[in-house]
Amino acid sequence: MNLWYNKICIRSSFLLEIADAETVSDMKGQKKTNAARILDGLSISYELREFPVDLDDLSAVHAAEMLNMPVEQVFKTLVARTDKAGVVMACIPGAAELDLKALAKAAASKKAEMVHLKEVLALTGYQRGGCSPLGAKKEYPVFLDASAKAWDKIAVSAGRRGEQIVLAPADLERAVHATTAQLTR
């Protein structure tokens, strides 16, 4: 039985609505991510969606395909550094390109640049393909692309490769104190 595609809804009351009992026993040994624990602590409803990890393609576009969601609804989290705000996180649609000038402006800075991939784990505690705006090692400013408002729900990484959290954009904003701005070209 392929357990990867079973839909799991986790509510703040910690009740699991799961399709079958076999999935319950498989999930008991798996620890929740920091992202999920933060949402639980804030009583924010979300859906945890899992899919098989392809180490050759860790993109948000691939995640969207695996989740059968529009790529514009699956947001990737990018880590950048600005001259005034320091390290920041930008959540943008999976196939979009980050506009660094727009990010700098949103962060009240003059300049922004992407951090090197080798720095991401040390800065956030997350691996490439599993970087979440929730639960990083430090609390960095989070900027959410304005296109998120077009959706009732968006998906962001749960903090582990192959896991996405689906939640309302307003709930993500509240959880990470995000600033919404036009961040893409």
Please place each PLM-identified region on the residue numbering.
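Extended, low-hydrophobicity, polar/charged segments
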Residues: 3-185
